[in-house]
Amino acid sequence: MADASRALRATARVAHVLTAALGVVVLVVAAYGMAGELNALRVEGMETFSVRDAAAFVGLLAALLSGSLLLGSAVPRIRIRLPARPLAPEDHPVYGFTTILAIGIGSTLGSPLFLLLPLNVIEYEIVSILSLTLAAILSIAMAKNNSDSYRVLKTNGLAAVGGPAFVRVALGTRSARYFIARFSMAVANTALAAYCVLVFVVFVFGYLPTLLAAYGLGGPPAYYIVAMITVLFAAWFVMNSLLERRYIRLIGRAQLVFTSLLVVILVVQSWLLGSAGGWNFRGLLAFPAASPLDWIGATIVNTGYLYLLFFGFQEIQALDREARDRSPIPVISWIRRGYTVSKERYFGVAMVATVLIAAAVNIFYALAVYVANPSPAGVAASQIPALYVARSVLGGPQEALIALAFMLATFTTFVPAFLAATRHIRSLGEDGFLPHTVARGAWIFVLAAIVFLAAAGQDFLVSITDYMVLVSLGIIALAAVWLRRDRRAAVERKDSLAVGVGLSCLVAAAALYVVTPSVAVFGSVSLAVAFLVYDLYDLGSLGTRLFLAVLDVVTFVLLSAYPRAFVAAGIPVLPGLEAAASGTDGLRIVLLLGGLVLVASFVADVVARAAEPPPEIPDGDGP
């Protein structure tokens, strides 16, 4: 009996090792294929989405899920302890109206402004200005709508961390619409953080050495300056992500200083650029040589593209737990001593004021760039167009000044975006959509996602941020309708603002498909996949294994009928495996093997459970 037991344990250990090895192989094949597809999105985009593309995508998804399950089930005794915060939310009310407003403006006037706006206004002229105005109007309406919903929640003593909280209260934590709103906002903030990291790397390691060399700072001094800025950026990230509670007041003061300097530099630079061009707006009102429907459509599409420059006011709602219940208001509280405003009111004022100030700065800078008339070819060829405009029109000192503004914008945008993404992931964990382990270590998973998304390139990150945030904001706006219970009709006149804003956001998101269909497909599929992962998590061990086994076999048949080659991923492959990894042949093999192993595991588990003796029911004397 003892020998049989030892043999059984040895067989189980061998099975675990083989299962883990198969899981690693499946994950490697899936990672190679996904890296190739991501590289294709970054370089070429995607004009069509054929049946073969769909089959390949489903195959990669099935391989990723199956490989993860095989590897995880084979090593159940391994536990990875991630540095984490307690899952239960904690309040640290230290920020007042001024700090909240500074954080909102800093999150909105981010590094994308320096790359997107100069090129967009040079290329699209009046359409760009109209798009900025339309995006500003939409954001003001959204801020007002969110302010009303926030007031309703706080008046009733409900949590209101982030805009998706409105959807959660209106529809419940198990609503698919709530999940889409929360997850979309998490992806949007993660993509924005990845974009900030990407352009920061381009600036520090590509542009800054050349700028320093122009002032005679080459060699070791330039290396030290680059290293110092990199260390400061890393220290700012660590302070905000890991030491936020300890240094929360210092972080708020730093955000206030950074944002103030950023706004002053942008306003001064805009005035100088406009003065250099004589504020000559000749030709600005010349509409494109196309039909009215064409340029109206172009304006709508461009509005969706530029909305990235305005949605930072959403970060204010994520600071509900860090904001004081009452706060003085600058100037008014100086005149009326002791005057304070409740959080329910000053949050709404801060959101609207953020959009108004950001819109004024964005439009003023866009008009200044237009009248400065820089070389369109030079702007298009520049890695950071705002720096090129400053150098070519105003000279080197102003280029250095706008470079400082760019660094400040990166600091004020990256960290709020990263923290907002982390808070959204944690909220999904609190609501049961994610395992508590993932929620507690949310900052690590967001950081890994930033590294992954950064490989997709700047254009993809801008578009996916726009698409996901517009989808989320559309649902959040409509939550104001769902929140109202005292109604006689499905939609009433008082719902006009919420319905108008929500539908406008969803239309703008749909319009992005015209420009970047790959982004719309990627965003929509990512939402479906994320909800699928939640469903699998909810199924339990047996249900997940059975589902993935069936998915693997079905996908194997699908790939046999519609084979496809993967784009070169740009990552090394083991010698002799290039042919298998470059097409769906290798993917089909690992899917078939994974499906068979999962079926065997499912059957063995069912048989083992059936063989277990039923639990003994203790005898009782009865009532």
Task: Give the predicted meaning of each segment.
Residues V161-R174, P209-T210, W334-V341, A350-V415, ...:
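TM-loop-TM module centered on a large, flexible mid-protein loop between adjacent transmembrane helices
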Residues V26-D53, H92-V202, Y307, I316, ...:
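Transmembrane helix-boundary motif of multi-pass solute transporters/channels
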Residues A2-I129, S139-K144, I329, I335-R345, ...:
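Membrane-interface "cap" regions at the ends of multi-pass membrane proteins
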